Amino acid sequence: IVFSIPNNIQNKSLESHLIENKIKYHKGSENNVVSRYLKTAKKFKAKNIIRVTADCPLVDPKMLDQMLHSFKANKIDYLANIKDPFNKHDKYYYPDGFDLEIFTTKCLEKSFKKIKTKYDQEHVTTFIRNSKMFKRQFVKNDVELTSLKLSVNTKKNLNDVKKIYNIFYPKINFSFK
């Protein structure tokens, strides 16, 4: 596990925690997140990247294993369990908060060279998701859960996720299902 964190004063305590616990990390641009991810990948010689963001703390280990298997077996550039931007009518995707993305460092390099907007620089995989130049795949869910929101962007979101963790604690590697 490697953290890719913004180089700013707000992350000093996080950086201290990472150092104290001997967790690998790289600091980079706060606004050009694609650049930060790419530099992190190169620093640690990563061929592939599994992206889990701080606002989506609910990682399903079984889902991740299945996605890794599919990613390797299908030799694709990008795999995610989020909504496919080219399939706007599909409602069968995973709830916000369980987001997982797997992509190659080569794919990230190609997108970095093509990106022209600040929005795409700030949102690591938006360009990749919205471009047909990459071999992309989106994992679908069996049920419609578009209204379920488990990402952490507010205090209420954080309290909701804490309740979920407390229900399963100490077995925190619970499955989405």
Where are the regions that the model predicts?
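Short internal beta-strands
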Residues: 1-7
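Short, surface-exposed amphipathic charged segments that create phosphate/polyanion-binding patches used
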Residues: 40-43, 93-98, 150-157
